A protein has these predicted regions:
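Short, solvent-exposed mixed-charge patches
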Residues: 515, 771-772
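Alpha-helical solenoid scaffolds that mediate protein-protein interactions
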Residues: 763-767, 771
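SAM/dcSAM-binding transferase cores
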Residues: 618-750
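Alpha-helical transmembrane segments of multi-pass membrane proteins
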Residues: 1-617, 622, 626, 735, ...
Length: 772
């Protein structure tokens, strides 16, 4: 349903504009080409220049314009540029046009046709031209060949050329899908990395077109040149996977400790060395096909339109079939091998004749084909890589899907589910930490009956809501975008050495697991939930920024019951203070109150939850008496026991995790921009800002910087005066201060600062044991 909705949306919003854009090249060719022998050269040059413009547009749109202007203003800019082009075209149309195609051939005897037929500029002129040619053919003796078609290849050869035109579009777009998937295994997958690959492909296609424009000047047989180009492109494709493995050290993540610009240059270099040779050579094929069209051309625009139509249909089918069928059925390496095979078969089928040169060319094609199938078979290459820092990690199972590559790995820390080699969705080794993402908000709001989880991953967090300790939970709905992740979770997380880590998520009648885009589901459904719980999302990954936008927070708020809350988990070890502040400012703009809660107290690995509350909400009171448990937990302990403390966790002591009221301290975030769908600053700034740090001073908001931020928030709005805590007792409202002191003690302990550790420990004990 979601896919069908997206297809309808794209068809209605983009089809009309793309249809009109598709007329540009044929119409320009009709205007510019006045010499039959120059058709191939000029058409290829036009195509190359046009594609260079596309590369420049992709670079600007991928790296700068959305951040500078926003998507809406960028679209307006594109419209203005299109109108300027239209105005320029209108002015050119006022100039007089030549009436005939000029020929560079030597004059023929009078009994032959000395001039090329008139250039048809309108439908009426084309029909008149066809009638005139038919009349000439009827008057010409049967043994006298036509001057226009005498050098034309046979009909079978023309069909082979049209098939190659289709394959050129099919192959290049299918390969772009495969190349993107290939590099998603080794890149951080921000919006910039995908833009880099697109720009490289477009630049190579443009350069290939310009090269083919030069080749069109040669007097060599066009079919021989075309065969050699296809053969060279196939050879480059065979080498691509092996070059990729060499440059990425067997698919290890490509990273740089330098600046953002040095990282982008590293990506450009790695991607260019890997895919540029094949993209450049294959990029010459379609433009050079225009050289073979010279013998058949009656109208430049008509010929260009025909070739472009066939090529574009191939491109559409290539992207669709590769993205939805080939990757699922064959995987990345076998799909690339099949596409290479198609190019080699096409080279063999081109009608070169049976002279020695042609036979040698076909023999070389056969040799390359055998090398592709056996000697350099890419199917033996690894599909994903394992973490070199993980001890004895091994791959258990892999799913190559249209969205991503999903793998289950096993190491000494447990069984993990990963996406694209390096993005971990969770592990059995982090069972308690993942389960706490459900437990913490349910301890704050123990009367919760219905929950929505945006993201399933291992299923541990969503399944945690079904724990018997949460007696009031009646409904859990969880959405996961990647179906193979659900498959992996069902297979490996429900029976981990006989234990169901998902808490019965896939068989409990209260739970519903959907393969759906969670954001879109919240926008479309009419269901209401007491808690909407959004999982951790890496902010600098492409697409993740949309889950931190004002519009998403607004649609989530609409899906809450009157007393419901929205919970957004944030991995501070992947956020700078800039990104955290942007997200906080955006949530403050949407929700009446926003509070911050710690997930853990481990310096360097901090996670927080930002909870959006609706108007008039306060935290519910708790009548649990935890006094004895609190005293027992610290009895006889000192700072050396910081890592071994077993503090009680219940709805009364949960305020120990409370970081503060961000709305009351909104002055700290007012200077930061909002993150919106129109201007997704998170998605475009995060990959840049986190590279501003150094190895000595990491940029993340963890450790002391985070503790300092909490101190600022609690100074502006002390827990004793926090409007969210009015239902709590005076001593209970001192628990957030105990949490802050405990976190500070952990930080100083890691620094081996004994005096500061003791001071923070004393403050922790004071606040932890405080009474009215």
């Amino acid at each position: 349903m979601a896919l069908a909705h997206q297809v309808r949306s794209l068809a209605t919003t983009r089809f009309p504009a793309r249809l009109l854009h598709g007329w540009h090249h044929p119409v320009m060719g009709q205007f510019m080409i006045r010499d039959r022998e120059a058709f191939g050269r000029i058409s290829a040059m036009m195509y190359g220049i046009n594609t260079l413009g596309a590369a420049l547009g992709a670079a600007l749109a991928g790296f700068y314009l959305p951040l500078w202007l926003g998507f809406n203003a960028t679209c307006v800019l594109a419209i203005v540029l299109s109108l300027a082009v239209a105005l320029a075209a209108f002015k050119l149309s006022l100039r007089p046009l030549p009436k005939t195609i000029q020929s560079n051939a030597s004059p023929e005897p009078k009994t032959e046709i000395a001039e090329a037929p008139p250039l048809p500029t309108t439908r009426q002129e084309r029909r008149a031209q066809e009638r005139l040619e038919k009349s000439r053919q009827e008057k010409r003796p049967q043994n006298e060949p036509s001057s226009i078609t005498s050098d034309s290849p046979p009909t079978a050869g023309r069909k082979a050329i049209m098939a190659l035109c289709f394959l050129s579009g099919f192959g290049v777009l299918a390969l772009e899908v495969l190349w993107t998937r290939m590099f998603s295994q080794v890149l951080e997958n921000s919006v910039y990395t995908f833009a880099t690959i697109l720009v490289i492909v477009l630049v190579c296609l443009a350069l290939g077109a310009l090269v083919s424009s030069g080749l069109a000047r040669l007097k060599a047989s066009p079919l021989v040149v075309l065969t050699l180009l296809v053969l060279a492109g196939a050879g480059a494709l065979i080498a691509t996977p092996h070059v990729f493995m060499y440059l990425t050290d067997e698919m290890q993540i490509v990273t740089s400790t330098g600046s953002w610009s040095s990282y982008i240059l590293l990506i450009f270099r790695t991607a260019a060395l890997t895919i540029a040779p094949s993209a450049l050579i294959l990029g010459t094929i379609f433009p050079y096909l225009m050289k073979t069209e010279e013998a058949h051309m009656k109208s430049p625009g008509q010929s260009l339109g025909r070739l472009a139509t066939i090529n574009t249909i191939g491109a559409i089918l290539g992207a669709l079939l590769c993205g939805f069928l080939l990757l699922d059925g064959l995987g990345i390496w076998r799909s690339m091998q099949i596409i290479t095979l198609l190019y080699l078969v096409a080279a063999l089928c081109l009608p070169l004749g049976w002279n020695l040169r042609s036979l040698v060319t076909k023999a070389v094609c056969l040799v390359v084909l055998l090398v592709n199938m056996f000697a350099l078979d890419p199917a033996s290459l690894p599909i994903i890589s394992t973490d070199p820092l993980a001890r004895e990690e091994k791959v258990i199972e892999i799913w190559e899907a249209s969205d991503c590559t999903v793998a289950v790995t096993e190491s000494q820390v447990g069984t993990s589910i990963k996406i694209n080699s390096h993005y971990s969705l969770g592990s059995t080794g982090a069972y308690m930490q993942e389960k706490l993402q459900a437990d913490l908000p349910l301890m704050i709001y123990p009367e919760t009956e219905s929950l929505f989880f945006l993201g399933v991953g291992t299923g541990i967090s969503a399944g945690g809501a079904l724990d018997p300790s949460h007696k009031n939970v009646k409904k859990v709905v969880a959405c996961e975008l990647v179906p193979e992740v659900i498959t992996a979770s069902k297979k490996y997380m429900t029976d981990f050495h006989g234990f169901d880590c998902t808490g019965g998520l896939f068989n409990d009648p209260r739970a519903t697991v959907l393969v759906e885009d969670g954001r879109h589901y919240l926008m479309a459904t009419n269901e209401k939930f007491d808690i909407v719980n959004a999982d951790l999302f890496v902010p600098f990954r492409s697409g993740a920024g949309s889950l931190y936008t004002k519009e998403h927070f607004e649609s989530s708020k609409k899906r809450l019951t009157p007393d419901g809350v929205f919970v957004q988990w944030l991995p501070l070890y992947q956020l700078t203070e800039n990104e955290f502040s942007i997200i906080a400012r955006t949530m403050i703009e949407v929700f009446d109150q926003v509070s911050m809660w710690r997930h853990n107290f481990q310096p360097g690995d901090e996670i927080v939850a930002l909870i959006g509350h609706q108007k008039g909400q306060t935290l519910p009171a708790s009548d649990i008496d935890s006094w004895a448990d609190k005293l027992y937990a610290i009895s006889g302990k000192d700072p050396s026991d910081l890592m071994r403390l077993n503090l009680p966790l219940d709805p009364q002591t949960i305020l120990f995790f409370y970081g503060g009221n961000l709305t009351a301290a909104r002055e700290l975030f007012e200077d930061y921009p909002l993150n919106t769908d129109d201007r997704p600053v998170i998605e475009y700034q995060a990959p840049r800002s986190y590279r501003k740090g150094s190895s000595d001073q990491p940029p993340w908001l963890v450790g002391a910087p985070f503790a300092n931020l909490v101190d600022k928030i609690q100074t502006i709005c002390p827990p004793s005066d926090d409007p969210l805590l009015v239902n709590r007792s005076t001593d209970n409202r001192r628990m957030p201060l105990a949490g802050s002191a405990f976190h500070r003690a952990r930080i100083e302990s890691l620094k081996e600062n004994t005096e500061a550790t003791q001071k923070a420990w004393t403050e922790f004990v004071k606040e932890w044991t405080a009474t009215d």
